[in-house]
């Protein structure tokens, strides 16, 4: 009996070792801690994907629009607890760059929801003042990440549209760690004030 209990426990734990592979309409949220959370520089120098997604006005946009300035791209969803946890700090970072323009910051929702619903979520739940309701309802950006894609994932692209790093999981974007990571954009990116 004890052997059976141990065997069942091992099978259950093995199922938890890797997130499920997303389908076209499924994305996995990252664990709060674990092997999938942290900085990934293995794609350094890769060009930004040329896929299109929706800007806050509902029009098509691509990351090429941000060429000439480093850009931080956060992929998130309303149902993703780590995403919701980090969005207020990402908004605070975005507020600090509204004036200086040293860093473009966009949060791209990965759900097939009306733009008005995503915008309302950002304004009422997150209390966002600077993050616009960018959307990728077809999850084209997530699709570029491969079968192990999880939310949130945040990318830093340099002014030439080349990936510097990606951060898997939530991060306090107002922290000294985030400021250090953002400084890798190729030009000084000041930490948010306050």
Model-identified regions with their sequence ranges:
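N-terminal targeting signals for export/organelle localization
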Residues: 1-50, 189-194
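Loop/turn elements at helix/coil->beta-strand transitions in domains of secreted/extracellular proteins
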Residues: 68-70, 101-104, 129-130, 159
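Conserved redox-active cysteine motifs that mediate thiol-disulfide chemistry
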Residues: 67, 75-92
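Thiol/disulfide oxidoreductase modules built on the thioredoxin-like
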Residues: 123-130, 135-184
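Structural microenvironment flanking redox-active thiols in thiol-disulfide oxidoreductases
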Residues: 85-126, 138-144, 194
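A short beta-strand-turn-helix
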Residues: 40-45, 50-71
